[in-house]
Amino acid sequence: MTQRRDFLIGAAGVAVGAVAATTVGKMGGKEDAPKMSAPAVQTKPTDIIKWRLQTYSGAPLGAHVIKPQIEAFNKAAFGEMEIELYYADQLVPTDELFRAMQNGTLDAVQSDDATMASPVDINVFGGYFPFSTRYSLDMPVLFKYYGLDKIWAEAYGEIEGVEWLSAGAWDPLHIFTKDPIRSVADLKGKRVFGVPTAGKFLSRYGLVPVTLPWDDIEVAIQTGELDGVAWCGFTEAYEVGWADVCSYALLNNVTGAWCGSYFANSNSWNALSPKLQELFKLSMDSSHYYRQVWYWGGEAKLRVEGKKMELTEIPKAEWDEVVADSESFWDELASISPRTEKVVQAYKEYSHVMEKAGVPYRY
């Protein structure tokens, strides 16, 4: 058996012999002497692929829901590609995001299907689908294990020029207002900035959904054009300044998570190398993870420690009636097409499993 001491002595002898041979070779001018090669230096490519990506969100919110992802992607792409990030309405109005991406004005978009007016039957499930989820983790599970990923891919696969890439969860939906809401009757007549599908449902109770440019919302609340927002959860309300102009926060939430997606122009996406495509997919996953943590922690902390808004609540008996009403709303959306029926069925199946699973999935 070779002993450690013998091995070290032998290795040292080989090293000395190699150095001697190299020295003799150099002194004798022999061309076949061993040569040391310079270390490889990685250089950035000269031709950079540039993308323009616009998000639905304004800059204060975008600093969390997408900016870290894009900065990390640009760094990791090492000069092969650079994504220029634009916020709500900077290049095109939010409701024109889809068409702008389809015609190549934009290379990619981050938005929900409904807000950007996607011409697909399933767009009603983008954003806030009332009472479809309890927690933000529900959303990725629905896409991964209950078939929503295949349904979304099928729907957008029928439209030329656009690729659906990935979906993820954002925050729960609460209502923030200047005047308190302590009963369902208090919803009547309140003009709120809100997302399409949830707004349509809440209009059953007299709430008035209003669409305005994202950056105009704070001023619209201050001037009385709006009575509040039904667009987000506590984290966003505090982050973007809406908590500064709203006095009350309704604890009853309309759903547990906002459903948003990433999309790309087909030509822009197909022009990328497989490596860059995978890198962008990884960056989307990193953004999904960032949002899960940011929202989950923020919602709880601000409910407990936030001091800008007074918390109100609609009594459970009244709110249970609203939840029950959502069943007919689900059926209404299911009747749009065979595909929307599949989506509703997936949500129903998932809800059944979660309720049957019990704590901690449902309480």
Regions found by a protein language model. Give the residues of each.
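N-terminal secretory/targeting leader peptides
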Residues: 2-138, 157-158, 162-363
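Short, solvent-exposed secondary-structure boundary motifs
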Residues: 151-157
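A gly/proline- and charged-residue-enriched helix-loop-helix capping module
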Residues: 136-151
